[in-house]
């Protein structure tokens, strides 16, 4: 008989960790030290649960790469003592944080499941309990004593996604996230069904490496009709800028104005990495498919293929932190490192 899985819940902040004080009509922090007392359904899950919380829980709008490092450090120091991890996080920036954690952890062999909620855990119609309970169940799921999941995932409203494939699509619906270019890894209904063929496999026994050096001197430039030379020029001349996520139209298309292409060329000559990512929710960048992307290809922009903007941001910070050569950066960005690209 296999031993009970031991799961660590890490509360960073967010709606899921709030309860309503009906006397004062305000939200207050949930007592995670008495988690099973407040959510007795957790006693039905065949696992042991411990909790840890940020000393000062964060609204996810205030999340910073330093906080990603903090989350990574908590998991790293507890890695050998637990079988899986559930990270509770505000939904607004969850895809950014979860994507970053996926890149920071090399040779991961245990589940790290991010979840949150649209309503506080104490609300009458809350989605928090189901998201939390099922995330713990997923993190504790094993076959022959080994975890079913060995990657960073995001669970929300009955679906488990690869974290670095997700994006938030709705501020009000319970179904707040989607994975536009990769199917769900598992679905929760009457039964919890894993799509085993879609999961990342832990193929080696190499020692866990946690990369905590992130360089956030990057920016997102979203192309729109009528964007001016002054705006682009001032943007590209920002001090200490190391990388740009260029959000283009469709399959990677952008204006062919001489001034625009010249500014991009100047940025590249200064050693700034430019990654072409589509503005579309789904689909992929295919540089050279149309005339309006041929010149971007000739300039040497990096294709983001079907990566999400959130994942591109996290991946760029991670790769910049490795201090690679330009060619190494280019090759690794265009390579699927954690299942973020098709």
Where are these regions (language model features)?
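ATP/NTP phosphate-donor binding region
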Residues: 1-77
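Accessory alpha-helical/coil subdomains and C-terminal extensions
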Residues: 3-4, 10-14, 32-43, 162-251, ...
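Short, ordered loop/turn segments at secondary-structure junctions
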Residues: 12-14, 90-91, 117-120, 249-250, ...
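Short glycine/serine/threonine-rich phosphate/pyrophosphate-binding segments
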Residues: 18-19, 93-98, 131-132, 253-255
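Short acidic, glycine-rich surface-loop motifs adjacent to enzyme active sites
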Residues: 82-94, 239-252
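Short Gly/Thr/Asp-enriched flexible loops that form oxyanion-binding sites at enzyme active sites
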Residues: 88-110, 256-263, 292
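Internal gly/pro-rich beta-alpha loop/helix module
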Residues: 114-189
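C-terminal non-catalytic interaction/assembly regions of soluble proteins
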Residues: 248-342
